[in-house]
UniProtKB/Swiss-Prot annotation:
This is Small ribosomal subunit protein bS18c. Keywords: Chloroplast, Plastid, Ribonucleoprotein, Ribosomal protein, RNA-binding, rRNA-binding. It comes from the Eukaryota. It holds the Pfam family Ribosomal_S18. It comes from Gossypium hirsutum (Upland cotton). The lineage of its organism: Eukaryota, Viridiplantae, Streptophyta, Embryophyta, Tracheophyta. Belongs to the bacterial ribosomal protein bS18 family. One of its GO terms (biological process) is translation.
Length: 101
C-alpha cells in the first residue's frame, strides 16, 4: 500500500465498554439513597442524562425518585455549604481605602 492510502486507515484499537451505572438488580426508589446520591451534584442538582450515561427511562425514574426524596425531606433541595464557606472567607476592607483628590 502506498503512503497516500495508508493515511486514511485507522488503527483498530480495542476499547473497554463502561459498565452501566444502574445494574439490572438495582431498584430505582426514593428510599434507595445510595443509588440516588450517585446522580446528584455537590450542589444538590440532578445531573443530566449525558453525564449519568443513563437511558431515557432510567433518567426519568431517577428524577422522579429524587423529587420524591426531596419532598419527603430525605434529600435537601439545595446544598449551600460552599456559599457559606465563601462568604466567611471574604472580608471587606473599606476602612483602608483612601480617596484620591
Amino acid at each position: 500500500m502506498d503512503k497516500s492510502k495508508r493515511l486514511f486507515l485507522k488503527s483498530k484499537r480495542s476499547f473497554r465498554r463502561r459498565l452501566p451505572p444502574i445494574q439490572s438488580g438495582d431498584r430505582i426508589d426514593y428510599r434507595n439513597m445510595s443509588l440516588i446520591s450517585r446522580f446528584i451534584s455537590e450542589q444538590g442538582k440532578i445531573l443530566s442524562r449525558r453525564v449519568n450515561r443513563l437511558t431515557l427511562k432510567q433518567q426519568r425514574l431517577i428524577t422522579i425518585a429524587i423529587k420524591q426524596a426531596r419532598i419527603l425531606s430525605s434529600l435537601p433541595f439545595l446544598n449551600n455549604e460552599k456559599q457559606f464557606e465563601r462568604s466567611e472567607s471574604t472580608t471587606r476592607t473599606t476602612a483602608l481605602r483612601t480617596r484620591n483628590k
